[in-house]
A protein has these predicted regions:
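Membrane-interface helix caps of multi-pass small-molecule transporters
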Residues: 53-57, 111, 141
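Cytoplasmic-side transmembrane-helix entry/capping segments in multi-pass membrane proteins
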Residues: 68-72, 96-97, 122-129
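Membrane-embedded alpha-helical segments that form the functional core of polytopic membrane enzymes
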Residues: 17-64, 80-96, 149-162
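Alpha-helical membrane-protein architecture signal
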Residues: 36-39, 64, 68, 104, ...
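Membrane-helix boundary/interface segments in integral membrane proteins
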Residues: 101-117
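Active-site His/Glu-centered metal-binding helix of metallohydrolases
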Residues: 16, 46-50, 54, 71, ...
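C-terminal membrane-associated helical module and adjoining short loops/tails
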Residues: 1-7, 12-13, 17-18, 37-45, ...
Length: 191
């Protein structure tokens, strides 16, 4: 299997989209439309699903894709949350907690990978990413980012983020014989 196939090209395009998302988010707070960065976040999320689907459907799941796809997810989430925190559209502590979890799981995967252990993506991890994207799009578009319904969504995303992070660490500690990961295993990108 070659590394630069269509699913991996889509993932690389998603990474290239991150600075565009950040710049359009910054512009939206200076009078630009928040619809554009919100739409770009949705496009990035849908491209993630498309890349994973194509990789599995065409049997083009590569080691490159397994490594780079979660990095693309984390770059998007981190970039968007950083801008939202700077713009005071989300509490800094919430952004730090979510980004901190993302970095911790990335570090866990890196250390485990060097030891020959695969940390697979769980269904909870995929759901976490989806809820994060919904929360980010809502924070971009909401006239009042501190409205009760927005806060419920943000705190739900935070809770799922922390629970899924704990699941990865617990899964690594409980797996004998070099296999690690959460209870539900998946070969698809994300997490």
């Amino acid at each position: 299997m070659q590394s630069l196939n269509l699913p991996n090209a889509i993932t690389l395009a998603r990474i290239a989209l991150v600075p565009v998302v950040v710049l359009t988010m910054l512009d939206a707070r200076r009078g630009g439309s928040p619809a554009l960065p919100a739409a770009l976040v949705v496009v990035a999320a849908l491209s993630d699903a498309l890349a994973g689907y194509l990789a599995r459907r065409t049997d083009e799941v590569t080691e490159f894709g397994r490594i780079v796809d979660p990095i693309a997810d984390k770059a998007l989430i981190t970039g968007a949350l950083t801008v939202l925190a700077v713009q005071n559209r989300v509490a800094v502590w919430v952004a730090v907690a979510i980004v901190g979890r993302e970095l911790a799981v990335t570090a866990l995967r890196s250390v485990a990978g060097r030891r020959g252990i695969t940390v697979s993506v769980s269904r909870l991890g995929k759901n976490k990413t989806t809820l994060q994207v919904v929360a980010i799009v809502t924070l971009i578009l909401a006239p009042d980012p501190y409205a009760w319904w927005v806060l419920i969504l943000v705190y739900a995303a935070l809770a799922l983020t922390l629970v899924s992070g704990a699941e990865y660490f617990a899964g690594l500690r409980s797996r004998p014989g070099g296999e690690a990961g959460p209870p539900e295993r998946s070969s698809s990108p994300g997490g």
